[in-house]
Amino acid sequence: MFLSNIPGDVRANEQLNLIAMHTIWMREHNRVARSLLFNNPAWLDDRLYEEARRIVIAEYQHIIFNEWLPLIVGTDLMQKFGLFPLTSGHSDLYLDTFDPRVSNEFATAAFRFGHSLIPSTFSKIAGTGARSGSSGSLNMKDIFFKPREFMVNKGNFFQK
């Protein structure tokens, strides 16, 4: 039996982490869109989509700046450059005219270090969160572009 996600980008089925992240963020987008529709029933689909997209991007950026980036660059640099999110209130620093693109040099060289953060082995876990043991391990090389394991196991994996 062949099971697959049908994402907008074929790379989404490349490995379990990507499948999980794409699924989580797609579901969050849809959850936000439903909430916006409930509170704004006159909004058209395009507006619902774009507003939900804007909110989910902000959520993603908050996680990046609050949890991931401090681990990568360290808290000293985060503090030095004022990169930590506010603990209360809001910032007026957002500029919709700011160009958020990444340079080709950064995208093709410097940021590729992130590939070294991808684990080579995943352990299956039970619905309770308990590991299934060594027989329940999956090697990245065996599941590359094979989303079946994710679909069959409903995303129950633990990175080693």
Task: Spell out what each predicted region is.
Residues 1-160:
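Long, well-ordered alpha/beta core segments of mature domains
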